[in-house]
Amino acid sequence: MNDKNNSRETEQNLILGKNPVMEALKADQPIDTIYLAGSGTIFSKIASMAKNNGVVVKNVNDQKLRQMCGTATHQGVVAVCACAEYATVEDILERAEEKGHAPFIIICDEIEDPHNLGAIIRTAEAAGADGIIIPKRRSASLNQTVHKTSAGAASWIPVARVSNLASVIDELKEKNIWIYGIDAEGADYTTVDLNGGIAFVIGSEGFGMGKLIKEKCDFLLSLPMYGHVNSLNASVAAGIFMYEAVRQRNK
């Protein structure tokens, strides 16, 4: 893979909420400090897990957490990570090899809404995808909203952030990975064979994939629409495609 597209980078990050923080601890994600504003079984469990991981725990009041998070919902639990480390595309391919199956990758093109990105990550992890690829520009990053919306899944699945999505797609094709773009003009998604190495490309709501990325796709796939609306939320559509791949690949 191109070195520019395949170098690890880090980003300061907060993880908010009980379940996302617990999942980050289970995944041994690097955390500097956990701030707790509450008591009870869950808070005690988080404190114990943090201690076992060598993470500093500070008991604070709710006002302190509001100062840290603004208006975001924190449930009385905030983890300050040393960094949010992005994977490389090679990491994702190696993960597929270690799992003993053909690569199953999700590419997000211009998904700027962190709630959508978080929901896509959550579904991708649940569906057993090997990783997510996002562009550096015009994309949500692995921020606190993404972590919270993913319900902790962002701690378990590698996310690569690349400078040139089009060139990465070319490199994936060279590795015999078929690129399937989700697009209203595509063929019925149930008519294609999703075995083998695959990557789904999910574009932004309203605009879809960029012109160049769309042209790079080997196939375009669509969902049949029988009602009055002509599109679905990006994360909902992505979930349907992912689980069709799961169904076919686990026959």
Can you say where each PLM-predicted feature lies in the sequence?
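N-terminal positively charged helical leader segments and presequences
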Residues: 1-95
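RNA substrate-binding interface of SAM-dependent RNA methyltransferases
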Residues: 23-30, 41, 48, 94-187, ...
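Short basic, glycine-rich beta-strand/loop surfaces that mediate nucleic-acid
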Residues: 68-82, 150-153, 158, 162, ...
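Short beta->alpha connector loops at strand-helix junctions that form conserved
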Residues: 61, 82, 109, 135-136, ...
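Active-site/ligand-binding-proximal alpha/beta "capping" segment
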Residues: 180-233
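Short glycine/serine/threonine-rich phosphate/pyrophosphate-binding segments
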Residues: 115-119, 209, 238
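Structured adenosyl-cofactor binding patch, chiefly the S-adenosyl-L-methionine
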Residues: 22, 27, 144, 148-153, ...
